């Protein structure tokens, strides 16, 4: 695959990328990690480059790992929130994108609405990269696929069980990535909460082509039987506080605890994109226990960001 095909492209969601391109990002993530631990703390492919971080929503992992990633690639970051820019005073997303394109080499945007990303990409002349939206979280999915490859030695044929909120943005990106990479994904979620239908349709078609599968069930124990990976996320995301009580009651049977992990048959790892609401979607004994790959997964965000930025930033 020619790397020039990726240079300068937006990354709004993984539906725009082939399985081969996603796999290359995943493998480069682990290569970046190997080089880091071999002593290459700086790989200066972004020397002289500036990456803007435009965040409507606060972050620990995304912001810090991106700032460190750009530094380890020899570039530098400019962090912005709407209140610190004219976006907070009514300047349009389109005008902001045009202006930032004159100063920066790429924009990573963490936004409340996916439509904001799409509008930014329409008017920017530099890559716009999704650092999280209400619909998807592609950078997280790249790190997650790298973690699975690192822990299981393969992606094709891996059984991933996602237990919890079926409309979760991270799940959407796991569906888009995993279906193109040959994973067997089972989502256990209440019938009232389903993945975005457009994303589900794309994932089902991609799974047919890759030899993977996608299934939606309501029983968490059915989902995790024989699973290689059990994955969950918070039940109430930022901006959903008004529906917190109703959602928590609905999702209580979907808590990942030791009993559920033992039902996998003993070979599964546990993954969570963090932050975790301990005692809600996952218990301490799971996230801190022998199943947990969460801390390696969190570290791999750093290396995934290096991989993606090194491929996309011109």
UniProtKB/Swiss-Prot annotation:
Coiled coil: none annotated. Its main location: cytoplasm. Keywords: Amino-acid biosynthesis, Arginine biosynthesis, Cytoplasm, Transferase. Carbamoyl phosphate binds at residues 59-62, 86, 110, 137-140, 273-274, 301. Its EC number is 2.1.3.3. GO terms for cellular component: cytoplasm. It is an enzyme of class 2 (transferase). It is found in: Cytoplasm. L-ornithine binds at residues 169, 233, 237-238. SUPFAM superfamilies: Aspartate/ornithine carbamoyltransferase. One of its GO terms (biological process) is citrulline biosynthetic process. The keyword tRNA-binding does not apply. One of its GO terms (molecular function) is amino acid binding. Belongs to the aspartate/ornithine carbamoyltransferase superfamily. OTCase family. Reversibly catalyzes the transfer of the carbamoyl group from carbamoyl phosphate (CP) to the N(epsilon) atom of ornithine (ORN) to produce L-citrulline. This is Ornithine carbamoyltransferase. It comes from Aeropyrum pernix (strain ATCC 700893 / DSM 11879 / JCM 9820 / NBRC 100138 / K1).
